[in-house]
Amino acid sequence: MVFRFLIISSLIWLSACSNYDPDLVVRLSTKEAKHLFGAIERGSEQRPAPHGSYAKGCVAGADQLAETGPTWQAMRLSRNRNWGHPVAIDFIHDLSAKAERESGWNGLYIGDISQPRGGPMLTGHASHQIGLDIDIWMRPADDLTLSVKKREAISSISMRRANGAYVNEKWSKQHHNIIKAAASDPRTARIFVFPGAKVQMCKDEKGDRAWLNKVRPWWGHHYHFHVRLSCPAGATNCKNQAPPPPGDGCKDAERWVRDILNPPPPNPNAPKRKPKPPLTLALLPQQCVGVLQSN
């Protein structure tokens, strides 16, 4: 509690400075960035801009997704992670409306986007730092009048069985169509979902398969799917992830499934993974100091 008070006090002082304060920046530069960004409760009064990469950056001028809209509800509001670049907020408006219009759901339940100014989070994600990552619950949004309290208690629904090798009986054509709509959007760079879902979509898709390229298998991601948007036009300080390899990616997803069902033996000579050092403010793009300093 004392540490959090000191962090917040430093941030208040930093934001109150009308000019760049190099001494304070030096003192804060060695602090874990998650404590600096995790202590801020609102977005910066700046022109919207993502700075850095999805797992090492921040976002200026983020918008807050309304807690409830005509076709969505933001979940787990206590986390204060319903902030994103305006492109991400517009994407949610569009995709949730399409889900309601074409998939028979009332809309979408939206999980984590970013903190008010992005940056590393106190708990959970390594990415979601520049306001362009969106978690969308697999649970059908059948009730868009959930109270704040209910949204803290309710959980999404897992779609996997056999540790993610296959979808379970709760998987539906609607899930396929909503993920297809998200992947078909030109703003989308990637979608992460558990391997069994990707393989199932590969089997079920009978039409255009180009969108499958953006759907990539990844661990977890069975209670939600994760949409990653490309850097917006003109965002010169934003770093895109390398695009997926050409093709529909179905063979790669099948390899993931084989490895789940028949795990390869561990390599006794594999080097031990060194734990990653925590991200400090000094390791983030220099623009992130200004994002913290802004009103």
What is each stretch, according to the model?
Residues 42-111, 171-180, 185:
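Active-site acidic/histidine clusters and adjacent loop/turn architecture
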